[in-house]
């Protein structure tokens, strides 16, 4: 049911080179707890309140093919990501019009021709694309960086997540990286686990996500202003950050507003 009962906002970001990818991927991975905490908007399951502000995040954290691998918080390059993908078990493989269970075999086994159920055939590009689509981590490498850690929300905030990360990744990258270099990997991973329940109160490096959200919101605004993308009303992209501004100003997530309405 989790694919039918959860909805997220996915964001795709470009990179220019492997070095550019390494920096952007590390930043986005490190900010995953903020993505969950700030954009928490799924406290309900089947018309009943759960114990979480982002129940969607909790559900996907619990899958064997999801989560935030520790290696994502290191200087992950293309080769290391390829190794990560190769050693992940196959969810399934296609045999003509049939779908065959992976049975613990990895994509590396597939490449070596060691899957007898498909007559030891080796993979094609399409097989790799299918395998990549069945890795449910909080972010993924494709021809772009795919962010998957935000809850979906209504129209007024739908562009907030993309705008938030656009401002950081494209125009305030080095300043953002300078901040997270002081964060310990285990602190980020702990915050990642706690964020679905604690939201803005989750702590990284002894400060709340609410605090860090304001720090990165300021950098995101700066980045969007420097991009200078103007609409026909002569307004720049910072207009899309209004929802995030309100959440951080009130120190209250959309999930908490839902909970208040349901309890009253």
Question: Where are the language model's segments positioned?
Answer:
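Residue-level signal for alpha-helical context at structural boundaries
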Residues: 29, 42, 46, 165, ...
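Charged/polar, solvent-exposed surface patches and flexible loops
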Residues: 23, 30, 37, 83-87, ...
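Loop-rich catalytic cores of soluble enzymes, especially ATP-dependent carboxylate-amine ligases
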Residues: 1-140
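Residue-level signal for secondary-structure boundary elements
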Residues: 33-36, 40-43, 93, 173-177, ...
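Short, charged low-complexity intrinsically disordered segments located at boundaries
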Residues: 18-19, 56-68, 192-200, 245-258
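Substrate-recognition/cap regions that form aromatic- and gly/pro-loop-enriched pockets
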Residues: 139, 144-232
């Amino acid at each position: 049911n989790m694919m039918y009962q959860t909805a997220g906002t996915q964001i795709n970001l470009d990179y220019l080179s492997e070095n550019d990818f390494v920096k952007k991927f590390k930043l986005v991975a490190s900010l995953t707890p903020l993505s969950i905490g700030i954009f928490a908007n799924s406290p309900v399951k089947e018309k009943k309140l759960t114990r979480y502000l982002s129940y969607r995040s909790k559900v996907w954290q619990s899958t064997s093919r999801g989560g935030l691998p520790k290696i994502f918080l290191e200087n992950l390059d293309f080769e290391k990501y390829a190794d990560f993908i190769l050693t992940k078990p196959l969810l399934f493989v296609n045999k003509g019009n049939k779908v065959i269970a992976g049975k613990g075999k990895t994509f590396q086994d597939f490449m070596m021709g060691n899957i007898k159920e498909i007559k030891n055939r080796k993979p094609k590009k399409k097989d790799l694309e299918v395998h990549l689509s069945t890795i449910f981590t909080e972010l993924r490498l494709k021809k772009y960086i795919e962010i998957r850690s935000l809850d979906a929300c209504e129209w007024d905030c739908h562009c907030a997540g993309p705008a938030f990360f656009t401002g950081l990744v494209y125009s305030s990258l080095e300043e953002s990286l300078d901040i997270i270099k002081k964060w310990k990997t285990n602190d980020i991973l702990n915050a990642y686990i706690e964020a679905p329940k604690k939201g803005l109160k989750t702590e990284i490096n002894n400060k709340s996500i609410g605090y860090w959200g304001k720090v990165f919101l300021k950098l995101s605004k700066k980045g969007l202003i420097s991009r200078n993308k103007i609409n026909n009303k002569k307004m720049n992209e910072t207009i899309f950050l209004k929802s995030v501004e309100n959440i951080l100003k009130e120190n209250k997530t959309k999930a908490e507003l839902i909970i208040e309405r349901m309890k009253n």
